[in-house]
Amino acid sequence: MREHWMENKTEQNCLISVIVPVYNILDCLERCVNSICGQTWKNLEILLVDDGSTDGTGKLCDLLAEKDDRIRVFHKPNGGSSSARNLGISMAKGKWIGFVDSDDWIEPQMYERLYEAAAAAGTSIAQASRDEIDEDYHKRPDVCTPPEQEVTCTAEDFLKTLLLHQGDCSFCTKPVSYTHLT
C-alpha cells in the first residue's frame, strides 16, 4: 500500500475533491475559492454546493466556475451545511476529500503538505492546525492547543483527543481518503 501512496505523491496524480458548502456569503466566497485554486497541489476539483443562497452567492458560484474548469457548482434548496457537505461527498470524484468553509481561506501548500504527510505515514487522514482570524485580520486565541510537533496516532487515539477537547474537530483542517469514508 505504501508504494501506491508514494506513486501518487511523486506524480501528483491523485485527485483531491475540495467541498465548499456555500450560503449567503457573497463578500467572502471569492477569496476562499481563489485560495483553493492557488494550491500547489494542482490536481483538485472544487465543488461549490450552494445551499439555497438568496443574496447572489449562487450566481457568483457560477461565475467562478466559468473561470476555472476544476470548479463544479451544485445548487440545492436550503438544508444546512451538513446536507451541502453530504451532496458534495456524493458528487466527488477524488480519492481524497477535503472541506473548506466558504468564509475561510487556506495557505497555498495546505493540500500538498497534508497529502505528503499522510503518504509518508501511510494513513488515510492528515490534519493541520489552524488560526482563527477576526474581522480586522488579527489572530484570535487558539481554539485548541496545536501539537508542538507532528504526531502519528491510531484512529482510536485521535477520537479520544477529540472527545477530550484536545484536538481540532473542524472539517476544514483534514483531508480524508475517500476509501476511509466508505
Predicted regions: what is each one?
Residues R2-L181:
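Nucleotide-sugar donor-binding/catalytic module of glycosyltransferases
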